[in-house]
A protein has these predicted regions:
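Conserved beta-strand position immediately N-terminal to the Walker
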Residues: 1
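AAA+/P-loop NTPase substrate/partner-engagement loops
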Residues: 21-53
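Conserved glycine(s) of the Walker
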Residues: 5-11
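Hydrophobic positions on the alpha1 helix immediately C-terminal to the Walker A/P-loop
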Residues: 14
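Short, polar loop motifs at secondary-structure junctions
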Residues: 8, 26-30, 84-86
Length: 129
């Protein structure tokens, strides 16, 4: 899931409310501290440096993540990115094929106004289908 929109609309709050026990991924390739959580949140992505990794981490195939001293299996089912930028905006310097590959891996939510709890529950139900 890719949640984007202006600052202050509750993107991070929405992600944390939807996946309260998620692993909070840093903006780098390292997965230190990950212990098999089903949900991962990459909050406030603001650079295109992870394009290659996102294609791997957000695909439906099994993959590994790098931790200091080795690799670990990534067992997540849901990967959430929050950003002020859309996929097109953040990866504008990449070729169309790479952007399309990233878009295929995400359900996109454009938040333009603060969300309400009921709307969040309805959206979670819709995305679970």
């Amino acid at each position: 899931m890719w949640i984007y929109g202006p600052s202050g609309v509750g993107k991070s709050t929405y992600a944390r409310a939807t996946y309260p026990n998620a692993f909070h991924k840093t903006q780098g390739k390292w997965w230190d501290g990950y212990i098999g959580q089903e949900n991962v949140i990459l909050d406030d992505l603001d650079s295109d440096c992870l394009a290659h990794h996102l294609k791997i981490w957000c695909d439906h195939y099994a993959c590994s993540g790098e931790s200091k001293g080795g690799t670990i299996p990534l067992l997540h089912r849901n990967f959430v990115v929050t950003s002020n930028y859309s996929i097109d905006q953040i990866f504008e310097k990449h070729d169309a094929e790479k952007i399309a590959a990233i878009k295929r891996r995400f359900k996109v939510i454009h938040m333009t106004a603060p969300f309400k709890k009921q709307e969040t529950e309805e959206l979670v139900d819709e995305l679970s289908v």
